[in-house]
């Protein structure tokens, strides 16, 4: 039995746009194509996973600067109003949009903010004024029910008191969950990550869109935009990207040219902040020989993301994990590991049998073979000292 743990294109499914519908399937297919065509050259997936920290920030920050056309097109805060119907579209009902935080289906026609208005995920008062690109960026300014938007104000996101938690949407002091039974914690985290990546600076890297108020690590706590980096990464990991986010990412790219990499590749967040968080080494065990990218072996305490595929390229239907919390999407084979409490053991059953040797061109995969740690590079096996394995 051979279980490969690899990264593939694809993220998640949410409750308001089921993959079973023809519209959702078509939208997901379009997403995969647009995602694959956007990351080219030194920004292809395999290349991004080989770098981290400031180097990774610089590469993606440059990509954002090169592809974002907000300023070139002369877009403004008012430009967003009529564009939402093509960006935040409700896959179930034409002409309607999905509201931020509550997941409600709203009319896509602008009614002078009587029903919905525009929510600055990164508040205007904390650096994203509507007069500058960051303040009218389609990726981060979202259509939101008027009452819900008023409830949040400019409060920083977080779980403790004095913070705003999108899992506890309140109107007139009455709390309720999002209408699609989903969560907007991860959505909010990924927008904040995006704003930092596009408009911030790190390690000497910044593009022409730089905004000195977009320095995430200086914007933590009640006076900032997030309670802590640890809570942000936790939300990002525990609430993976949904189909609605994917559809929105495509629409935002159509509108202004650039994408949100944290929706396309959630893994890059862990690599980007590796040196800002304590690093934990996880012992990951499988019930069969396996390959796993070494970056997943050392990551932040928030966890890691991997993709499970059997020898025939199918995703196992049955998977369990001990030693950690986990979320598994069998449709995509995506496994999100959270709340690690010890050695992580992943058990997979009912997969294709294969006793033949499988080679791969994937860079720097790590796995165990006959009790020895092996690193695969360009189809050649090396030991931990870099010597070819005979």
Feature map (PLM): residue ranges:
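Hydrophobic h-region of N-terminal signal peptides that target proteins for export
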Residues: 2-10
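N-terminal module-boundary/linker segments of secreted carbohydrate-active enzymes
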Residues: 11-103, 271-272
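Short, His- and charge-rich active-site/binding loops that engage polyanionic ligands
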Residues: 97-108, 112-115
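Domain-level detector of nuclease and nuclease-like folds
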Residues: 110-117, 122-278
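Residue-level detector of functionally pivotal "anchor" positions at catalytic/ligand-binding pockets or at interdomain
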Residues: 277-283, 349-377
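Secondary-structure capping and domain/repeat boundary segments
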Residues: 278-352
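Short, glycine-anchored, charge-dense loop/turn motifs used at functional sites
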Residues: 382-387
